[in-house]
Amino acid sequence: MSIPANVLMEISFQELTSKKSEEYERKRLNEIGDLLTPQKIEEVLNCKDTKQRNVSLEDIFQDFLNFIITKNQEMFSMDCNSICKSYVLKVAEEKIEKLLKENGTLKNEEKCLRMQIVAQEEYVAPLIQKLEIIEKKLDKSFRKNMEDELRITRLASENNVLISRIDRTKRHFSELFTQKQMLQLQNENFKDDYEKIKEENKRLYKERKSFLSKIEKSACEIHDLKESDSFKDHEILRLKEERTAAMQAIDDISGTIETIKSDCYKVESENKGLINEVMDMRNFVQQLEQELYAFEDDYSRIQNDEELLKVGMIHLNKSENRTVEEMKIGDFGNTEEAKDVCVSDEDIHNVNIKQITTLIGKMSQVQIECKRLRKENLFLQSERTHLLRELEELRHLATSAKEDFVKVEKLNKIIKDENENLKEYIRNNSLSFQATAGELTQCKQLPQPRITGNDQENSHYTGAGNNCLELVGKENNCKNQYPQYFSNIDESNAFINNQCLELEALNRKNDLIRGELDSLKEKNLVAQKQLKSANNTLHVRAKHIQILENTNQSLKKNLENGRAEFRLKEIALIDLANQQIKNQDKTIHDLNTELCSLTLDYCNTAVERDTLRFRALEYLDHNKQTNPLPYHIVYMFSFETSPTVFQTSPEEDKENVNNIKISQPRNSLQTNGYIEGMANNVLDASFNVEDESHAISDSELGYFCEDQSNIYEVEDMRYYLFYTEEEKNMLPGFIVNARPANLDLFPCCYETTDKRSKHLKNMLNKKKLIKHIFHL
């Protein structure tokens, strides 16, 4: 069986298209394989840095774009117009009108496609703007993340510093707590010692009372013995001896009492000092607790930048940057200079505390800013996620566009193959048509057949006619088949034009993408410059922070040196004060020894004077219950031994009590504890009668001060109170000008009722002066 020509043409056309498509795919795969090698893929996958990975991906995409552009240029370089012209020349003139009509339709379709392209460009323009905005935001977020990481590292180091400070303060607090416990134990021991001393004082007071009762009994016995004349001389001698022994015993007891009092006053002063130290320690502990709470609050709150705090540390007082050599202790001979130095150190310490409070305020501001930055960071992270989603969508669209472009390229290749096959088929048909035309001309040139009876000629003519009929059939078949082929060619040409327009649009998009890539490269360069500048600024700030830390350490050292200096100055001042107290104690001891010797001599002379005077004996006859000798004894022990001076006018009589004026106390007998307590007891004697430590109790007042007083008693008291001019010349001034400590014992020394308030005022002024002198 013979296969028709149409089937053969279709089979050959399919074989050619399959071969060409396979060759094209092989070439394309080989070229793409040259572009995407496994080495490049491994390099991209092994890149840990996102920047390098992005750069390598951009290079790969650029290579793909260049490949696509070259292929498009090759497609356009093909002489499609010449092919179309060759087809049009071969086609009959009747088809020209159809082609013109189809050209009009194609122009309309071209306009529609251009409108679609413009619409797509308008749709793509805002997406490109969004991409630029997204890239800017990503750059900002990346910078902020880098800054946040640096701040976090900074704050971690600063938090470690704060933790070390808190540990130091806790250790210091524990040491202070142990010191506080030790001081409390010492205070309790001092209290126990003070109570023991009080009990001993009471016991000695009872012994003194018993001793005074014995003296009274002995005085009564003396009175009984004096009534007998035979034993007077003997008893007088015995009484003198007993009196001297009693006076010595009383002096010893009074000395022990005074030592006990001095010990009590020393204990009281030590207790006061300990109480002050305990109060200072409590205040210091409270300050440390406040500092601990402040440090703990700072440790819990500080999670961000403290640059403001460090800037504030620069403005600290530069006067504190003193070296240790400048802070050495000099000569502390002048106590006022030492006090001024201590006051200046305290002022510096107060200034440091104020600066610390200002820094705490700045830290609170920094915490507020940290919270604000956290909120901004969260907002930026949310925006970043949104932008990343949009980028993924755009990448998906780009991949879909690439796939469409690949499909279009495949279709273009298929159409090219079809065009080539059609060209070959048309060439073959044209050759066969020319052959048939030549045969027809030959047939026409043949002579017409003769109608004869010759069979050979008839057969010849019939064979030629059959051949002519076959040729005419072939021609008709070709004419019937040509319009189908031409219609297919027109459709393929229209499709090619559409594909060309799409390729032009894709080229434009590629140009836009190139421009965007160039802009991205420029932005990357700018970002790199900014990163370099940021790194430089960070390096400078790190150096600045190191300088601030060094200054902070130097300030801490200066504070420690200042505290050490303050302690050394305190120790030096305490040593000076102790030396002065020792010197004053020595002077007081010397004066007390002199006073005791003088009082003993005077007592002996007074005893002799009492025995020789007849006036005393008359007084004993009138009032047997009283005795001038105990009065005199009590007078000597109840007199004030403080350094008071009584001034009188030379013209008036010194024995007149109203003419005596109190002068200020002397500064030569200033002591720390002994004279202070003695002066307080002496001044409070006229107001506190119920005090057990007083020289004379209420029971003794009943003995010495009776309601039945007479003129003789007052005169006798004046006699014993005031000395004669000879005695005044013999005795020293502080004994001559002495006055009784308790005026209730000596009514003759009372002032008038009008002047009683003045006397009390003078006593109060005296108290104030003593307190001012002893710095109470």
Swiss-Prot record:
Per UniProt, which keywords does this protein have?
Answer: Coiled coil, Meiosis
* Sections of the chain in a coiled coil: 87-122, 173-227, 265-307, 362-430, 496-595
Q: What does the entry give for GO biological process?
A: meiotic cell cycle
Give the signal peptide, or none: none
Q: Does the keyword Coiled coil apply?
A: yes
Protein's name in the database: Meiotic expression up-regulated protein 1/2
Q: Which organism is it from?
A: Schizosaccharomyces pombe (strain 972 / ATCC 24843) (Fission yeast)
Instruction: Name the encoding gene, please.
Output: meu1
